[in-house]
Amino acid sequence: MSFAAAQATYVLHSRPYKETSALVDFFTPLGRLRAVLRGARGKAGALARPFVPLEAEWRGRGELKTVARLESAGVPNLLNGQALFSGLYLNELLIRLLPAEDPQPEIFAHYAATLPLLAAGRPIEPLLRAFEWRLLEQLGYGFALDVDIDGRPIEPQALYQLLPEAGLEPVAQLQPGLFQGSELLSMADADWSAPGALAAAKRLMRQALAPHLGGRPLVSRELFMNRKESPRD
């Protein structure tokens, strides 16, 4: 796939590379790619920060490309506090889950629309759950919230467990990790005002994402938990 033409892009992650360069993970509508940014201590390096709308061109046909041009393409999304950790979480999900150079224009558009909402202080949990759900769907890991694995409508009073590769299965006996049918129906309608809906959605998304993330913990989640546990001055 050619990345020679100018593309809208965001930096997902950057780290020093050799003496004056950086190794940067970019996200574009044409997919995720890794490239060497030369002169990273100059103007280009100052631009190559997460959450900044950019336009870029790349050279190279292999997996590791070289940045040929990098320019600002909009107002930076200034994320602070919990919004910052949430943005880092989204970036880490994209790095861990997206195959390299696999076009994902819908995910890119959703990501670009989510960042300004985080910066504006919108409620974070619904934004994260919506992004996780879109990511799962677009990668082929989605499942129905209003019917079970046999196509029967979800019953509000019934209990269900998630089978990540199949969907929601009704269970008769109480056990850890189950979901009330009413919670699932609230998620299907994106009714976050319903009691327990947001907490259940967080559990559901963790269960759904876990098989695809492998056993390695998310660094962004650990950073956020450490921040919460750190004593305040």
Swiss-Prot record:
SUPFAM superfamilies: ArfGap/RecO-like zinc finger, Nucleic acid-binding proteins
One of the record's GO cellular component terms: bacterial nucleoid
Disulfide bond positions: none
One Pfam family of this chain: RecO_N
GO BP annotations listed: DNA recombination; double-strand break repair
Keywords: DNA damage, DNA recombination, DNA repair
InterPro entries: ARFGAP/RecO (IPR037278), DNA_rep/recomb_RecO_N (IPR022572), NA-bd_OB-fold (IPR012340), RecO (IPR003717), RecO_C (IPR042242)
DNA repair recorded as keyword: yes
Annotated family: Belongs to the RecO family.
Role this protein plays: Involved in DNA repair and RecF pathway recombination.
Descriptive protein name: DNA repair protein RecO
UniProt lineage: Bacteria, Pseudomonadati, Pseudomonadota, Gammaproteobacteria, Pseudomonadales
Gene: recO
